[in-house]
A protein has these predicted regions:
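Basic, amphipathic alpha-helical patches used to engage nucleic acids or provide basic targeting signals
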Residues: 1-6, 28-100
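Solvent-exposed, charged helical/coil patches
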Residues: 1-24, 99-103
């Protein structure tokens, strides 16, 4: 587990922490089944991963996602650049995927 978050992870955590996102409780950097989850909401079985260029064409990510999906999790991935430069698009996508209304 890393001690410091990437800039994109810190930006996403600012949006999610303290139930700021539609009162949904997220935890960050959570060890689970030999993996470290960037952000997880156990109540909704939802994982959010923030990816950099090291994740391009990553078979390891595909295997990891398959294992977590088989345990009932939905995995949503966003690119670092999108979180940092297109925050509104990321939020709209997240609201839509969760079926949530927002102001």
């Amino acid at each position: 587990m890393r001690r410091t978050a990437t800039l994109a992870e810190a930006a996403m955590w600012h949006l999610l922490r303290d139930r700021r996102f539609s009162n949904v409780k997220f935890r960050r950097q959570v060890p689970f089944q030999n993996y470290i989850l960037d952000f997880v909401c156990f109540e909704r079985r939802l994982i959010i991963e923030i990816d950099g260029s090291q994740h391009l064409d990553s078979n390891r990510d595909e295997r990891r996602d398959a294992v977590l999906a088989s345990d009932g999790f939905q995995i949503i991935r966003y690119w670092n650049n999108d979180v940092l430069q297109r925050r509104n698009v990321v939020l709209e996508d997240l609201f839509a995927k969760l079926g949530l209304d927002h102001d």
